[in-house]
Protein backbone atom coordinates (compact mmCIF):
# COMPACT_ATOMS: atom_id res chain seq x y z
CA UNK A 1 0.00 0.00 0.00
CA UNK A 2 1.50 3.31 -1.11
CA UNK A 3 1.51 6.37 1.19
CA UNK A 4 -1.55 7.96 -0.45
CA UNK A 5 -3.59 4.80 0.09
CA UNK A 6 -2.52 4.68 3.76
CA UNK A 7 -3.64 8.28 4.27
CA UNK A 8 -7.01 7.60 2.61
CA UNK A 9 -7.52 4.44 4.75
CA UNK A 10 -6.67 6.19 8.05
CA UNK A 11 -8.85 9.15 7.13
CA UNK A 12 -11.80 6.92 6.27
CA UNK A 13 -11.48 5.06 9.58
CA UNK A 14 -11.29 8.30 11.55
CA UNK A 15 -14.33 9.67 9.76
CA UNK A 16 -16.25 6.49 10.53
CA UNK A 17 -15.38 6.69 14.23
CA UNK A 18 -16.43 10.35 14.29
CA UNK A 19 -19.79 9.57 12.68
CA UNK A 20 -20.38 6.70 15.17
CA UNK A 21 -19.54 9.00 18.09
CA UNK A 22 -22.01 11.64 16.86
CA UNK A 23 -24.73 9.01 16.48
CA UNK A 24 -24.12 7.73 20.04
CA UNK A 25 -24.36 11.25 21.46
CA UNK A 26 -27.63 11.90 19.60
CA UNK A 27 -29.08 8.63 20.90
CA UNK A 28 -27.97 9.53 24.44
CA UNK A 29 -29.68 12.92 24.27
CA UNK A 30 -32.89 11.40 22.92
CA UNK A 31 -32.98 8.74 25.65
CA UNK A 32 -32.34 11.33 28.37
CA UNK A 33 -35.18 13.55 27.16
CA UNK A 34 -37.56 10.60 26.97
CA UNK A 35 -36.66 9.46 30.50
CA UNK A 36 -36.95 12.90 32.08
CA UNK A 37 -40.33 13.42 30.41
CA UNK A 38 -41.52 10.13 31.90
CA UNK A 39 -42.14 11.71 35.37
CA UNK A 40 -39.81 9.42 37.25
CA UNK A 41 -41.20 6.17 35.91
CA UNK A 42 -38.36 5.47 33.54
CA UNK A 43 -34.93 4.06 34.11
CA UNK A 44 -33.33 4.93 37.42
CA UNK A 45 -31.17 3.42 40.13
CA UNK A 46 -33.10 3.36 43.39
CA UNK A 47 -32.26 2.10 46.84
CA UNK A 48 -33.03 2.48 50.52
CA UNK A 49 -30.12 3.14 52.84
CA UNK A 50 -29.64 3.70 56.57
CA UNK A 51 -27.34 6.49 57.71
CA UNK A 52 -26.29 7.60 61.19
CA UNK A 53 -26.03 11.30 61.99
CA UNK A 54 -24.42 11.96 65.40
CA UNK A 55 -26.22 9.17 67.29
CA UNK A 56 -29.47 9.62 65.29
CA UNK A 57 -30.47 6.96 62.77
CA UNK A 58 -32.28 8.08 59.59
CA UNK A 59 -33.73 5.80 56.95
CA UNK A 60 -33.53 7.37 53.49
CA UNK A 61 -34.68 6.39 49.98
CA UNK A 62 -32.07 7.50 47.45
CA UNK A 63 -33.19 7.96 43.80
CA UNK A 64 -30.30 8.52 41.37
CA UNK A 65 -30.74 10.23 37.98
CA UNK A 66 -27.38 10.10 36.27
CA UNK A 67 -25.51 12.85 38.16
CA UNK A 68 -28.47 13.92 40.35
CA UNK A 69 -29.50 12.34 43.71
CA UNK A 70 -32.95 12.80 45.23
CA UNK A 71 -33.06 11.92 48.96
CA UNK A 72 -36.45 11.27 50.52
CA UNK A 73 -36.66 10.84 54.34
CA UNK A 74 -38.70 7.81 55.41
CA UNK A 75 -40.37 7.84 58.83
CA UNK A 76 -38.99 4.99 60.94
CA UNK A 77 -41.75 2.59 61.90
CA UNK A 78 -42.13 2.12 65.66
CA UNK A 79 -41.79 -1.33 67.20
CA UNK A 80 -44.99 -3.22 66.55
CA UNK A 81 -45.22 -5.50 69.56
CA UNK A 82 -45.13 -5.18 73.34
CA UNK A 83 -42.52 -7.30 75.09
CA UNK A 84 -43.94 -10.36 76.79
CA UNK A 85 -41.60 -10.60 79.80
CA UNK A 86 -43.59 -13.48 81.34
CA UNK A 87 -40.68 -15.91 81.04
CA UNK A 88 -38.91 -17.20 84.17
CA UNK A 89 -35.52 -15.91 85.25
CA UNK A 90 -32.58 -17.85 83.90
CA UNK A 91 -30.64 -19.86 86.47
CA UNK A 92 -27.35 -18.05 87.14
CA UNK A 93 -24.20 -19.81 88.31
CA UNK A 94 -22.20 -16.59 88.37
CA UNK A 95 -22.19 -13.05 87.02
CA UNK A 96 -20.00 -11.83 84.16
CA UNK A 97 -19.04 -8.19 83.46
CA UNK A 98 -21.39 -6.50 80.97
CA UNK A 99 -20.14 -2.89 81.06
CA UNK A 100 -18.14 -0.32 83.01
CA UNK A 101 -18.38 3.39 82.20
CA UNK A 102 -15.30 4.79 84.04
CA UNK A 103 -17.09 8.14 84.04
CA UNK A 104 -15.11 9.78 86.84
CA UNK A 105 -11.70 8.79 85.46
CA UNK A 106 -12.71 10.13 82.03
CA UNK A 107 -14.28 13.19 83.64
CA UNK A 108 -10.99 14.47 85.02
CA UNK A 109 -10.31 15.79 81.50
CA UNK A 110 -13.55 15.11 79.61
CA UNK A 111 -16.96 16.75 79.53
CA UNK A 112 -18.69 14.30 81.87
CA UNK A 113 -21.76 15.05 83.99
CA UNK A 114 -21.74 15.00 87.78
CA UNK A 115 -24.25 12.23 88.52
CA UNK A 116 -25.72 9.91 91.12
CA UNK A 117 -28.21 7.07 91.06
CA UNK A 118 -27.22 5.43 87.75
CA UNK A 119 -29.29 2.41 86.64
CA UNK A 120 -29.76 0.21 83.59
CA UNK A 121 -32.87 -0.76 81.64
CA UNK A 122 -33.28 -2.57 78.31
CA UNK A 123 -35.48 -2.37 75.22
CA UNK A 124 -35.83 -5.17 72.63
CA UNK A 125 -32.83 -3.72 70.77
CA UNK A 126 -30.49 -2.11 73.34
CA UNK A 127 -29.69 -1.47 76.98
CA UNK A 128 -29.22 2.07 78.27
CA UNK A 129 -27.68 3.54 81.39
CA UNK A 130 -29.89 6.16 83.02
CA UNK A 131 -28.58 8.64 85.58
CA UNK A 132 -29.58 11.74 87.52
CA UNK A 133 -27.30 14.64 86.62
CA UNK A 134 -26.63 17.67 88.81
CA UNK A 135 -26.71 20.12 85.89
CA UNK A 136 -22.92 20.39 86.08
CA UNK A 137 -19.71 18.80 84.86
CA UNK A 138 -16.88 17.15 86.74
CA UNK A 139 -13.87 19.38 87.42
CA UNK A 140 -16.00 22.53 87.06
CA UNK A 141 -17.05 25.19 89.57
CA UNK A 142 -20.73 24.24 89.29
CA UNK A 143 -19.92 20.82 90.76
CA UNK A 144 -19.55 22.49 94.18
CA UNK A 145 -22.19 21.27 96.62
CA UNK A 146 -23.50 18.41 94.48
CA UNK A 147 -23.70 16.15 97.53
CA UNK A 148 -27.29 17.51 97.78
CA UNK A 149 -29.97 15.03 96.65
CA UNK A 150 -32.67 17.40 95.42
CA UNK A 151 -32.25 20.57 93.38
CA UNK A 152 -33.96 22.27 90.40
CA UNK A 153 -30.91 21.45 88.27
CA UNK A 154 -31.20 17.68 88.42
CA UNK A 155 -32.32 15.86 85.28
CA UNK A 156 -32.69 12.25 84.16
CA UNK A 157 -30.52 11.50 81.13
CA UNK A 158 -29.31 8.32 79.43
CA UNK A 159 -26.55 6.89 77.24
CA UNK A 160 -26.02 3.55 75.56
CA UNK A 161 -24.70 1.08 78.09
CA UNK A 162 -20.93 1.31 78.54
CA UNK A 163 -20.68 4.96 77.52
CA UNK A 164 -19.63 7.51 80.11
CA UNK A 165 -22.34 10.05 81.06
CA UNK A 166 -20.84 12.65 78.72
CA UNK A 167 -22.44 15.71 77.17
CA UNK A 168 -21.94 14.53 73.59
CA UNK A 169 -23.78 11.21 73.75
CA UNK A 170 -26.28 11.76 76.58
CA UNK A 171 -29.99 11.99 75.79
CA UNK A 172 -32.32 14.09 77.91
CA UNK A 173 -35.20 12.12 79.44
CA UNK A 174 -36.90 14.12 82.20
CA UNK A 175 -36.51 16.87 84.79
CA UNK A 176 -36.03 14.80 87.95
CA UNK A 177 -34.27 14.27 91.25
CA UNK A 178 -35.79 10.79 91.58
CA UNK A 179 -36.68 8.54 88.67
CA UNK A 180 -37.40 5.20 87.04
CA UNK A 181 -37.50 4.11 83.38
CA UNK A 182 -38.43 1.05 81.33
CA UNK A 183 -39.34 -0.04 77.79
CA UNK A 184 -42.59 -1.85 76.96
CA UNK A 185 -41.38 -3.13 73.59
CA UNK A 186 -42.64 -0.10 71.68
CA UNK A 187 -41.38 3.00 73.47
CA UNK A 188 -39.47 4.17 76.55
CA UNK A 189 -41.46 5.26 79.58
CA UNK A 190 -39.80 7.44 82.22
CA UNK A 191 -41.11 8.69 85.55
CA UNK A 192 -39.30 11.77 86.84
CA UNK A 193 -40.00 13.31 90.25
CA UNK A 194 -39.20 16.99 90.78
CA UNK A 195 -40.44 20.04 92.66
CA UNK A 196 -40.54 21.14 96.31
CA UNK A 197 -40.34 18.53 99.07
CA UNK A 198 -43.92 19.12 100.21
CA UNK A 199 -45.53 19.26 96.75
CA UNK A 200 -43.36 17.18 94.45
CA UNK A 201 -44.77 15.91 91.17
CA UNK A 202 -43.92 12.83 89.12
CA UNK A 203 -44.20 13.34 85.36
CA UNK A 204 -44.78 10.20 83.28
CA UNK A 205 -43.21 10.50 79.83
CA UNK A 206 -43.90 8.00 77.05
CA UNK A 207 -41.87 8.15 73.88
CA UNK A 208 -40.34 11.39 75.14
CA UNK A 209 -43.70 13.14 75.58
CA UNK A 210 -45.41 13.96 78.93
CA UNK A 211 -48.55 11.82 79.19
CA UNK A 212 -49.58 11.71 82.87
CA UNK A 213 -48.61 13.01 86.33
CA UNK A 214 -48.67 11.89 89.96
CA UNK A 215 -48.91 14.56 92.65
CA UNK A 216 -47.47 14.03 96.12
CA UNK A 217 -50.19 12.47 98.28
CA UNK A 218 -48.44 12.73 101.67
CA UNK A 219 -46.51 15.96 101.17
CA UNK A 220 -43.15 14.52 102.24
CA UNK A 221 -40.63 13.97 99.42
CA UNK A 222 -42.46 11.82 96.87
CA UNK A 223 -39.85 9.43 95.47
CA UNK A 224 -39.47 6.30 93.38
CA UNK A 225 -37.16 3.39 92.62
CA UNK A 226 -33.88 4.80 91.17
CA UNK A 227 -33.80 1.68 89.02
CA UNK A 228 -35.69 0.06 86.16
CA UNK A 229 -39.47 -0.23 86.30
CA UNK A 230 -41.00 -3.45 84.91
CA UNK A 231 -43.18 -3.97 81.83
CA UNK A 232 -45.20 -7.15 81.22
CA UNK A 233 -47.35 -7.49 78.08
CA UNK A 234 -47.45 -3.73 77.60
CA UNK A 235 -48.33 -2.84 81.20
CA UNK A 236 -45.57 -1.14 83.21
CA UNK A 237 -45.31 -1.26 87.01
CA UNK A 238 -43.35 0.76 89.55
CA UNK A 239 -43.37 1.56 93.28
CA UNK A 240 -43.39 4.99 94.94
CA UNK A 241 -42.94 6.22 98.52
CA UNK A 242 -44.21 9.42 100.13
CA UNK A 243 -43.51 10.16 103.77
CA UNK A 244 -40.73 10.07 106.38
CA UNK A 245 -37.49 8.21 105.74
CA UNK A 246 -37.10 7.16 109.39
CA UNK A 247 -40.62 6.10 110.38
CA UNK A 248 -43.91 4.92 108.86
CA UNK A 249 -44.48 6.27 105.34
CA UNK A 250 -47.02 5.64 102.57
CA UNK A 251 -46.32 3.31 99.65
CA UNK A 252 -48.10 2.77 96.32
CA UNK A 253 -47.87 0.53 93.28
CA UNK A 254 -48.62 2.16 89.92
CA UNK A 255 -49.57 0.55 86.62
CA UNK A 256 -49.45 2.34 83.26
CA UNK A 257 -50.09 1.54 79.62
CA UNK A 258 -48.57 3.71 76.91
CA UNK A 259 -47.53 6.08 79.68
CA UNK A 260 -51.04 6.62 81.00
CA UNK A 261 -51.80 5.43 84.54
CA UNK A 262 -54.50 2.74 84.47
CA UNK A 263 -54.26 1.48 88.05
CA UNK A 264 -52.76 2.08 91.47
CA UNK A 265 -52.99 0.50 94.89
CA UNK A 266 -51.78 1.41 98.37
CA UNK A 267 -49.41 -1.04 100.07
CA UNK A 268 -50.42 -1.88 103.63
CA UNK A 269 -47.19 -2.40 105.54
CA UNK A 270 -47.61 -1.26 109.13
CA UNK A 271 -44.34 -1.39 111.02
CA UNK A 272 -42.37 -1.88 107.81
CA UNK A 273 -40.66 0.59 105.54
CA UNK A 274 -40.27 0.48 101.74
CA UNK A 275 -38.02 2.66 99.60
CA UNK A 276 -36.05 2.40 96.36
CA UNK A 277 -37.30 -1.00 95.24
CA UNK A 278 -35.23 -3.00 92.74
CA UNK A 279 -37.73 -4.90 90.60
CA UNK A 280 -37.67 -7.43 87.76
CA UNK A 281 -40.18 -9.65 85.90
CA UNK A 282 -40.37 -13.34 86.79
CA UNK A 283 -43.00 -15.81 85.57
CA UNK A 284 -45.58 -13.12 84.85
CA UNK A 285 -45.21 -11.23 88.14
CA UNK A 286 -43.07 -8.34 89.35
CA UNK A 287 -40.65 -9.23 92.15
CA UNK A 288 -39.03 -6.42 94.13
CA UNK A 289 -36.30 -6.28 96.76
CA UNK A 290 -36.38 -2.93 98.55
CA UNK A 291 -34.75 -0.77 101.23
CA UNK A 292 -35.97 -0.38 104.81
CA UNK A 293 -34.65 3.01 105.90
CA UNK A 294 -36.36 2.85 109.29
CA UNK A 295 -35.11 -0.10 111.35
CA UNK A 296 -34.62 -3.28 109.33
CA UNK A 297 -31.25 -4.60 108.21
CA UNK A 298 -33.18 -7.24 106.31
CA UNK A 299 -34.73 -6.15 103.01
CA UNK A 300 -38.46 -5.82 102.24
CA UNK A 301 -39.84 -8.14 99.54
CA UNK A 302 -42.78 -7.11 97.34
CA UNK A 303 -44.38 -9.40 94.73
CA UNK A 304 -46.92 -7.73 92.41
CA UNK A 305 -49.52 -9.52 90.27
CA UNK A 306 -50.96 -8.04 87.04
CA UNK A 307 -54.25 -7.21 88.83
CA UNK A 308 -52.22 -5.14 91.37
CA UNK A 309 -52.76 -7.62 94.19
CA UNK A 310 -49.53 -8.12 96.08
CA UNK A 311 -47.69 -9.89 98.87
CA UNK A 312 -45.28 -7.98 101.07
CA UNK A 313 -42.82 -9.07 103.75
CA UNK A 314 -39.09 -9.39 104.25
CA UNK A 315 -36.37 -11.49 102.67
CA UNK A 316 -36.46 -14.62 104.81
CA UNK A 317 -32.73 -15.38 104.70
CA UNK A 318 -30.80 -15.55 107.96
CA UNK A 319 -28.09 -13.31 106.47
CA UNK A 320 -28.65 -9.50 106.47
CA UNK A 321 -28.01 -7.63 103.21
CA UNK A 322 -28.60 -3.95 104.07
CA UNK A 323 -25.94 -1.49 105.30
CA UNK A 324 -25.30 -0.69 108.11
CA UNK A 325 -25.89 -4.10 109.69
CA UNK A 326 -24.70 -6.32 112.51
CA UNK A 327 -22.74 -9.54 112.43
CA UNK A 328 -24.12 -12.36 110.25
CA UNK A 329 -23.81 -14.75 113.19
CA UNK A 330 -26.13 -12.62 115.35
CA UNK A 331 -28.85 -12.30 112.72
CA UNK A 332 -31.72 -14.79 112.71
CA UNK A 333 -33.85 -13.67 109.77
CA UNK A 334 -37.60 -13.10 109.43
CA UNK A 335 -40.07 -13.38 106.55
CA UNK A 336 -42.52 -10.90 108.07
CA UNK A 337 -40.80 -8.37 110.34
CA UNK A 338 -37.89 -5.93 110.24
CA UNK A 339 -34.88 -7.05 112.27
CA UNK A 340 -32.08 -4.90 113.65
CA UNK A 341 -31.85 -1.39 114.99
CA UNK A 342 -29.25 0.17 112.72
CA UNK A 343 -31.65 2.40 110.77
CA UNK A 344 -30.65 4.19 107.59
CA UNK A 345 -29.82 1.82 104.72
CA UNK A 346 -28.76 1.67 101.08
CA UNK A 347 -30.56 0.68 97.89
CA UNK A 348 -29.93 -2.99 97.07
CA UNK A 349 -31.32 -5.97 95.17
CA UNK A 350 -31.84 -9.71 95.07
CA UNK A 351 -33.01 -12.38 92.59
CA UNK A 352 -35.24 -15.33 93.39
CA UNK A 353 -33.96 -18.62 91.97
CA UNK A 354 -36.67 -21.10 92.91
CA UNK A 355 -36.50 -21.02 96.71
CA UNK A 356 -32.88 -19.82 96.68
CA UNK A 357 -31.86 -16.17 96.41
CA UNK A 358 -28.93 -14.28 94.96
CA UNK A 359 -28.48 -11.17 97.12
CA UNK A 360 -26.05 -8.28 96.74
CA UNK A 361 -24.55 -6.36 99.66
CA UNK A 362 -21.60 -4.17 100.61
CA UNK A 363 -18.67 -6.05 102.10
CA UNK A 364 -18.34 -3.50 104.88
CA UNK A 365 -21.02 -3.79 107.56
CA UNK A 366 -20.86 -0.07 108.42
CA UNK A 367 -20.07 1.86 105.23
CA UNK A 368 -20.77 1.78 101.51
CA UNK A 369 -17.53 0.09 100.54
CA UNK A 370 -16.79 -3.17 98.79
CA UNK A 371 -19.48 -5.27 97.14
CA UNK A 372 -20.30 -8.96 96.92
CA UNK A 373 -23.15 -11.10 95.68
CA UNK A 374 -24.00 -14.25 97.61
CA UNK A 375 -26.33 -17.16 96.92
CA UNK A 376 -28.30 -18.41 99.92
CA UNK A 377 -29.94 -21.82 99.70
CA UNK A 378 -33.69 -21.54 100.46
CA UNK A 379 -33.10 -17.90 101.40
CA UNK A 380 -36.26 -16.68 99.65
CA UNK A 381 -38.57 -18.85 101.74
CA UNK A 382 -36.66 -19.82 104.92
CA UNK A 383 -34.39 -18.26 107.56
CA UNK A 384 -31.47 -20.05 105.97
CA UNK A 385 -27.81 -19.18 106.61
CA UNK A 386 -26.58 -21.68 104.01
CA UNK A 387 -24.37 -19.52 101.78
CA UNK A 388 -23.57 -21.69 98.77
CA UNK A 389 -21.79 -19.20 96.53
CA UNK A 390 -19.98 -15.86 96.82
CA UNK A 391 -18.55 -13.55 94.17
CA UNK A 392 -16.69 -10.32 94.96
CA UNK A 393 -17.38 -7.42 92.57
CA UNK A 394 -15.55 -4.59 94.39
CA UNK A 395 -12.99 -5.23 97.11
CA UNK A 396 -13.53 -3.67 100.52
CA UNK A 397 -11.12 -0.72 100.53
CA UNK A 398 -12.92 0.71 97.48
CA UNK A 399 -16.17 2.68 97.54
CA UNK A 400 -19.46 1.23 96.36
CA UNK A 401 -22.98 2.66 96.78
CA UNK A 402 -26.44 1.89 95.46
CA UNK A 403 -27.11 -1.32 93.52
CA UNK A 404 -30.11 -2.53 91.57
CA UNK A 405 -31.55 -5.12 89.20
CA UNK A 406 -32.76 -5.42 85.61
CA UNK A 407 -33.17 -8.24 83.08
CA UNK A 408 -32.12 -8.86 79.50
CA UNK A 409 -35.28 -9.53 77.46
CA UNK A 410 -35.55 -12.61 75.27
CA UNK A 411 -35.62 -10.32 72.21
CA UNK A 412 -31.99 -9.46 72.96
CA UNK A 413 -30.67 -12.85 74.04
CA UNK A 414 -32.84 -15.26 71.98
CA UNK A 415 -33.15 -17.42 75.11
CA UNK A 416 -36.31 -18.84 76.61
CA UNK A 417 -35.67 -17.12 79.94
CA UNK A 418 -34.86 -13.64 81.27
CA UNK A 419 -31.20 -13.08 82.11
CA UNK A 420 -30.81 -11.54 85.60
CA UNK A 421 -28.42 -8.57 85.71
CA UNK A 422 -27.40 -5.98 88.26
CA UNK A 423 -25.41 -2.77 88.48
CA UNK A 424 -23.32 -1.36 91.32
CA UNK A 425 -22.80 2.36 91.79
CA UNK A 426 -19.36 3.53 92.95
CA UNK A 427 -19.74 6.85 94.77
CA UNK A 428 -16.75 9.19 94.86
CA UNK A 429 -16.16 12.58 96.45
CA UNK A 430 -18.10 14.03 99.37
CA UNK A 431 -18.76 13.13 102.13
CA UNK A 432 -16.00 10.51 102.32
CA UNK A 433 -13.30 12.23 100.24
CA UNK A 434 -11.76 15.71 100.07
CA UNK A 435 -13.56 17.20 97.08
CA UNK A 436 -16.19 19.88 96.45
CA UNK A 437 -18.41 17.43 94.55
CA UNK A 438 -20.13 14.04 94.75
CA UNK A 439 -20.49 11.78 91.71
CA UNK A 440 -20.36 8.12 90.72
CA UNK A 441 -19.57 5.56 88.05
CA UNK A 442 -20.94 2.03 87.70
CA UNK A 443 -20.12 -1.59 86.91
CA UNK A 444 -22.78 -3.87 85.35
CA UNK A 445 -22.87 -7.68 85.65
CA UNK A 446 -25.15 -10.29 84.05
CA UNK A 447 -25.95 -13.86 84.99
CA UNK A 448 -24.27 -16.73 83.14
CA UNK A 449 -24.35 -20.51 83.49
CA UNK A 450 -20.72 -20.66 84.65
CA UNK A 451 -18.92 -19.72 87.84
CA UNK A 452 -17.02 -16.42 87.59
CA UNK A 453 -13.93 -15.59 89.62
CA UNK A 454 -14.00 -12.79 92.19
CA UNK A 455 -12.15 -9.59 91.31
CA UNK A 456 -12.40 -5.85 91.95
CA UNK A 457 -13.88 -3.69 89.20
CA UNK A 458 -13.60 -0.54 91.33
CA UNK A 459 -13.88 3.08 90.16
CA UNK A 460 -10.16 3.84 90.11
CA UNK A 461 -10.24 7.65 89.75
CA UNK A 462 -7.36 9.50 91.44
CA UNK A 463 -8.68 12.33 93.61
CA UNK A 464 -8.70 15.24 94.25
CA UNK A 465 -9.24 16.93 90.87
CA UNK A 466 -7.83 20.32 89.87
CA UNK A 467 -11.06 22.09 90.86
CA UNK A 468 -10.72 20.71 94.41
CA UNK A 469 -7.29 22.34 94.85
CA UNK A 470 -8.37 25.90 94.02
Swiss-Prot record:
PTM note: N-glycosylated.
Pfam family, one: Neur
Intravirion side: 1-14
Active-site residue numbers: 149 (proton donor/acceptor), 402 (nucleophile)
One annotated Gene Ontology cellular component of this protein: membrane
Positions annotated as glycosylated: 39, 46, 54, 84, 144, 293, 398
Positions of the UniProt region annotated as Hypervariable stalk region: 32-86
UniProt entry tagged with the keyword Methyltransferase: no
Cofactor: Ca(2+)
Record keywords: Calcium, Disulfide bond, Glycoprotein, Glycosidase, Host cell membrane, Host membrane, Hydrolase, Membrane, Metal-binding, Signal-anchor, Transmembrane, Transmembrane helix, Virion
Cellular compartments annotated: Virion membrane; Host apical cell membrane
EC number(s) on file: 3.2.1.18
Binding site for Ca(2+): 292, 296, 322
One function term, GO molecular function aspect: exo-alpha-sialidase activity
Membrane-crossing segments per the record: 15-35
Modes of activity regulation: Inhibited by the neuraminidase inhibitors zanamivir (Relenza) and oseltamivir (Tamiflu). These drugs interfere with the release of progeny virus from infected cells and are effective against all influenza strains. Resistance to neuraminidase inhibitors is quite rare.
Family: Belongs to the glycosyl hydrolase 34 family.
Note: The influenza A genome consist of 8 RNA segments. Genetic variation of hemagglutinin and/or neuraminidase genes results in the emergence of new influenza strains. The mechanism of variation can be the result of point mutations or the result of genetic reassortment between segments of two different strains.
Subunit and interaction comment: Homotetramer.
Name of this chain's protein: Neuraminidase
UniProt organism field: Influenza A virus (strain A/Equine/Santiago/1/1985 H3N8)
